[in-house]
Amino acid sequence: MSAILKQRVRYAPYLKKLRTGEQCIDLFKHGQYLGWSGFTGVGAPKVIPTTLVDHVEKNNLQGKLGFHLFVGASAGPEESRWAENNMILTRAPHQVGKPIAAAINDGRTQFFDKHLSMFPQDLTYGFYTKDKPNGSNLDYTIIEATAITEDGSIVPGPAVGASPEMISVSDKIIIEVNTKTPSFEGIHDIDMPVNPPFRQPYPHTSADFKIGKTAIPVDPEKVVAIVESTSGDKVPPNTPSDEQSRGIANHLIEFLEHEVKQGRLPANLHPLQSGIGNIANAVVEGLASSNFKNLTVWTEVLQDSFLDFFESGSLDYATATSIRLTNDGFKKFYDNWDTYSKKLCLRSQVVSNSPEIIRRLGVIAMNTPVEVDIYGHANSTNVMGSRMLNGLGGSADFLRNAKLSIMHTPSARPSKVDPTGLSCIVPMASHVDQTEHDLDVVVTEQGLADLRGLAPKARAKVIIDKCSHPDYKPQLQEYYDRSVFYATKKKTLHEPHILRDVFKMHLNFQENGTMKLDSWDQKF
């Protein structure tokens, strides 16, 4: 037992349950229902998942030792190895990584995505274990901790996610105490699940409001093993902003400045929500260098750019369920713990993504889709309507309930044969996650379309005019004009479409590698 482990585990009875990963292998059987801590690749268990996949590889047990796996969102690289070894029978509600996506799209893993605010509560309702043959609880939850308090409660690390709910509905719990990661004690605010009809309103009225519980309570009798973990989180470098993403950010900031001038937003805006990726980075960079001050953030995930945002002096406070930093970012965070720990809070995902709180605070939500159609429907998950990327995540939690719901995307993306082979503005989205009723603004590097108060045909005109790529604008305009002509004859002018043509851009991409049509009369 290392000295630092003994220091971190302040509940002495747990030290009698100290095990190695190998000593835990026999606890696991094919078909069990497992919960993991973690969110967006940080705070997930490492020792037990790695030990189990090593065991499968060593003994050729691929397909013979598989599990129903639940994680708050995406886990770390350990999940990729599980997917490569056919160890994931079912998975929810969100994932990231080529191996797990391949397993889903090959049909080896059954995946269901769900709004991240709803997934943990639905787990406590028994929705995901209703067909489990031996009870409705998870068999095991494996949770990473950075400390354990005197009463046995768990202090998470850089992610809270769905851990409180998983622990509450788990038969047995394994705690991995990560002694590589500094203790995060004091930075969390934990709400434990209370199911209807006893659930009370959330009292949060500002981004910095706290309930005051800094650790996850647990029944010590359920804890069957304590395992020391000495591996840190492995987060790949962030995608840097580029000219295109900075163009999108500039349009957005100009729009927000206009909203302030018109009196629709206060000078320090409302709490901001932003995803991850180069567009989100560019937006954060743009806000940090703008004239906005005393800003707050209410979001799912904080990444490296938020540390610079704090340092700019523009950001007062940020709250999320995960702080997903690179190695350099974590070092900077730990080196300045006294500064950052006073300015941010990590909460469970049912709180960070709560529709009630998002609506009350008037959050400004900004997310990136796969595609947006001319009437304002957005696809966030399924490429060409069928191939799963990562899952819905929390985008709809925010976009359905925010004061301003913004989708930002490049106007076009490259394909293998055409540098603008994929238009992100299409006649009809091949899959719909956010409806026309949810979005207020669509923005690309070409421009910004303000959709508020517009009927469908007016939305189509402004989206085509402001957001589409020049390579596609005439083609999209022609589709719209033909649809209006057709719908006029049919007296179906509310939201004009020609169903025989509406997916021709997608079909042409599948056949020819580009969405550029020779003609709308082209046959497929």
UniProtKB/Swiss-Prot annotation:
One of its GO terms (cellular component) is mitochondrion. Pfam families: AcetylCoA_hyd_C, AcetylCoA_hydro. Keywords: Cytoplasm, Hydrolase. Its main location: cytoplasm. It is found in: Cytoplasm. CoA binds at G275, I276, G277, N278, I279, N390, G394. The active site is at E300 (5-glutamyl coenzyme a thioester intermediate). Coiled coil: none annotated. InterPro entries: AcetylCoA_hyd_C, AcetylCoA_hyd_C_sf, ActCoA_hydro, ActCoA_hydro_N, NagB/RpiA_transferase-like. It is an enzyme of class 3 (hydrolase). It comes from the Eukaryota. GO terms for biological process: acetate metabolic process; cellular response to alkaline pH. It catalyses: acetyl-CoA + H2O = acetate + CoA + H(+). One of its GO terms (molecular function) is acetate CoA-transferase activity. Signal peptide: none annotated. Its EC number is 3.1.2.1. Presumably involved in regulating the intracellular acetyl-CoA pool for fatty acid and cholesterol synthesis and fatty acid oxidation. Has antigenic properties. Elicits a specific immune response in systemic candidiasis human patients undergoing malignant hematological disorders. Belongs to the acetyl-CoA hydrolase/transferase family. This is Acetyl-CoA hydrolase. It comes from Candida albicans (strain SC5314 / ATCC MYA-2876) (Yeast).
